[in-house]
């Protein structure tokens, strides 16, 4: 299956949200496009000294096309992002054919990658930790225990366990075929469950927030308010090493986790996380404003919700970034749909259950 839409970064989360509900056949084709890259992803994992498969951060043909590893290849969460899109698609469409064929094979290989990438740390009470990764925020790179990455990896592992066990119970012939295709061993499934059950997720009890990563709260906060507007986006005006030693965020990270996995956060945690991270977020990525708008609406910051919504809607219409000549921001367009549906209409769709709270 080929695609005219490149596979890049968080597009699996942003574009597929709207497509699953409005054009599920296209969402299905895009997931099958990802599956067509699985062999290259297996090769990429071996290059990175890992088992399983590691999908590229940017690609049009299955080969990694990112120029800068810290803001590209280090975003291992791409595996979990793709599997999140698969999970949403399966829950909403009930398409067992895709899930139990191409989908489950990707689940097996991505789960293998996670248990090989992480380890059980005695210093963290035996919790499963994932080090040397970059989360969605590309202004904070190659860190330990990025909250978004760990939480999404946990969902990836849980979903892999659930799907494989369902196949074993309900479709034993297909399960045997899967074992043959992937050399799956029963003890691997137990290893996925154990890693997911013991996943380390940073939390600061004093502040009542989820630190973006292990060391984020120890960094000096960037003075965004007094940084001249002409020096944004920061990545075009400051050396990465200057940016990396500060608390400054290119795009929603913990806040994105609160949108995708909102049922895992309390209302108080959402409010405190948003209040802490929003002032540190530059919005230098076109993918940030839509997520900030959705969570702002949820926590009652209505003026901010509307302001971010306007910014997201005008990203291409008003050429906010000054780069429309290079093409439309497809993922951001998907984000504007999410603002209307998830933000102002208050829709949530966790575990296949849809609710509305406008």
Tell where the protein language model's regions lie, with residue ranges.
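Acidic/histidine-rich catalytic neighborhood
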Residues: 109, 113-184
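Hydrophobic, well-ordered secondary-structure elements that form the walls
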Residues: 107, 292, 340
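TPR repeat positional signature
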Residues: 79, 83-86, 149, 157, ...
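Active-site core of glycosidic bond-cleaving carbohydrate-active enzymes
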Residues: 11-37, 101, 158, 165, ...
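Catalytic cores of secreted or luminal carbohydrate-active enzymes
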Residues: 329-358
